[in-house]
């Protein structure tokens, strides 16, 4: 099955598409980077105050957990790059997207998990640090890198043009994300918004 997924003609033969399929890849690459917003700093920063309240941590403790999770995730990104080279962008984007979603669900229940272990700042710190590790690794790291690299395989002559076009939409999305997430938190609550 894995061998079949890695083939260029799965799930359909792109040579039969009546236009250059690289333009579809441009759209998907842009979406892949935008989907990584929860793993980016500007995506997680909106949840700082709700997480402080829910976990009972100080701002410094939450910041240290974020830092440790970020540094820890960076140590594994070279291994993810090797997996990208081995399995290809399609599989890495799919797996990292699913893993990012699971890590966001994990973060939404970190205070409840901490409560199962008696609560307190230690378990809250450990669980949110693991959550930060996951969203930084799968979102900011693997998903963003894989989405960027997938596009480069499709374009040679127009690589600068498509990279800059993608950059415009990504910048626009990244600038709107904190406002949209803050609105979702205000309308519902932080757990609902993080899902």
Task: Report each predicted region and the residues it spans.
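Helix-to-loop junctions at the C-terminal end of transmembrane segments
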Residues: 75-89
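Structural signature of the two symmetry-related core transmembrane helices
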Residues: 91-106
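Hydrophobic core of transmembrane alpha-helices in multi-pass small-molecule transporters
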Residues: 34, 103, 117-142
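Intracellular juxtamembrane helix-capping segments at the cytosolic ends
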Residues: 51, 139-155
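Extracytoplasmic
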Residues: 21-59, 76-80, 177-178
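Helix-loop-helix hairpin linking two adjacent transmembrane segments in secondary transporters
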Residues: 169-195
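Structural signature of transmembrane alpha-helices in multi-pass secondary transporters
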Residues: 66-73, 166-174
């Amino acid at each position: 099955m894995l061998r079949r997924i890695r083939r260029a003609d799965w799930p359909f033969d792109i040579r039969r598409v009546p236009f250059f399929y690289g333009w579809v890849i441009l759209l998907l690459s842009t979406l892949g980077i935008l989907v990584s917003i929860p793993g980016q700093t500007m995506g997680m920063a909106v949840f700082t105050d709700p997480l402080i309240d829910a976990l009972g941590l100080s701002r410094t403790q939450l910041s240290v957990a974020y830092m440790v999770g970020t540094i820890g995730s960076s140590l594994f990104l070279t291994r993810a790059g090797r997996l990208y080279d081995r399995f290809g962008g399609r599989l890495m984007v799919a797996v990292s997207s699913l893993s990012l979603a699971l890590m966001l669900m994990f973060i939404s229940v970190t205070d409840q998990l901490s409560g199962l272990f008696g609560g307190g700042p230690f378990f809250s710190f450990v669980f949110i640090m693991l959550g930060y590790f996951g969203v930084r690794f799968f979102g900011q790291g693997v998903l963003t890198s894989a989405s960027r690299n997938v596009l480069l395989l499709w374009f040679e002559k127009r690589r600068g043009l498509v990279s800059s076009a993608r950059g415009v939409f990504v910048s626009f999305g990244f600038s709107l994300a904190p406002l949209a997430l803050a609105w979702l938190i205000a309308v519902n609550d932080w757990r609902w918004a993080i899902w």
